[in-house]
């Protein structure tokens, strides 16, 4: 099986990001900040996380205080950028809860902006108190294949944001079976307030 089967259809995180259909899901805002409803099929989320875990240099596992219903996504020490503002904590760029399906990702601020404006995410509650970097987002879980594609793209942006140039230029990351033309920089336009 192609570990990057869906990475061929990445969506640009920019003004062209499609709007998420329907109302924003209800969330409980607090230190945990979870999505309360409007979840898709649990299997789609688990398959997406399995796909992301297979990407190069990703270490996945529960947090020390976690459970089997929580997956922490970290990049390997040798390829992690030294900028702490791109991580939730340590080298963790993403976290997924399965009990109350919720996705947490650290995104570049321009991507976070478009994810919020287009209805795909909201800032993590703890960011307003400086407890997590401002790019940490609660990304709404996918309800169908089109939404899986958007979430996959958001995971991809978060993952690349956490890598050093060396990590993005590694042989494994650039392997031909990946099926994606990679850019070593993330370039999204920043929206101007009007």
PLM regions: where:
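Charge-dense, helix-prone N-terminal extensions
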Residues: 1-194
